[in-house]
């Protein structure tokens, strides 16, 4: 979120893991405006280099100055953060040496330390809002960790998509079910098998 591309997560973690006896990854995540969505959340992130590390440096939290980074240049959309979290969880599934992780934080909260944020004095890294309304990223975690069967189509607060006429749109479904069939206007778009290593949405993604 503050430096590098999230797709470098595992390679960076492996490098750091080799320097310690036990590896616990805490305080990971990123901000997202509830109800802000994007057809291409990566559009403004082309200037961020890959493979150069992910260490946080002084001033990285600021919205001005410094190197290209998602926290400064991104759109803070729910569309971006679900993919960041999905990628981390996908990778953690195969990181058997990982002692544990702690996402930061559970809920958006007020803070005097963020007067410059787009919503002043609010840290928006939570998976739920301050009134406990669930953000989209809540369902990403649920699809990996809950035992009770669940299913959620991304974008319940995004009723109107945009783009060219008849342009195919990405549909993401978060579920812990072994297989999911998607219907659009009563027509089946096919059955897909859940596979945590098939990014995004553990293979439950369609273009239609």
Label every PLM stretch briefly:
Residues 1-133, 137, 141, 148-162, ...:
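Substrate-binding/catalytic cleft of secreted carbohydrate-active enzymes
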Residues 151, 180-208:
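Long, low-complexity serine/threonine/glycine- and acidic-rich segments characteristic of extracellular
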Residues 174-179:
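Short proline/glycine-enriched turn/loop motifs at strand-loop junctions of beta-rich domains
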């Amino acid at each position: 979120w503050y430096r590098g591309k999230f797709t470098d997560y595992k390679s960076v973690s492996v490098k750091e893991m080799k320097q310690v006896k036990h590896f616990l990854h805490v305080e990971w995540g990123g901000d997202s405006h509830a109800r802000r969505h994007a057809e291409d959340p990566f559009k403004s992130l082309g200037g961020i280099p890959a493979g150069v590390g992910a260490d946080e440096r002084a001033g990285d939290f600021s919205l001005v100055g410094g190197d290209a980074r998602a926290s400064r240049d991104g759109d803070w959309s729910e569309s971006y953060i679900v993919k960041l979290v999905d990628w981390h969880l996908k990778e953690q599934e195969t990181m058997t040496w990982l002692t544990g992780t702690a996402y930061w934080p559970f809920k958006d909260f007020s803070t005097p330390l963020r007067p410059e944020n787009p919503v002043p004095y609010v840290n928006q890294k939570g998976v739920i809002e301050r009134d406990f309304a669930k953000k989209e990223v809540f369902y990403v975690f649920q699809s990996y960790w809950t035992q009770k069967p669940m299913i959620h189509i991304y974008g319940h607060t995004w009723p109107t998509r945009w783009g060219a006429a008849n342009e195919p749109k990405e549909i993401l479904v978060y579920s812990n079910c072994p297989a999911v069939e998607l219907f659009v206007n009563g027509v089946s778009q096919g059955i897909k098998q859940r596979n945590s290593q098939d990014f995004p949405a553990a293979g439950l993604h369609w273009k239609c």
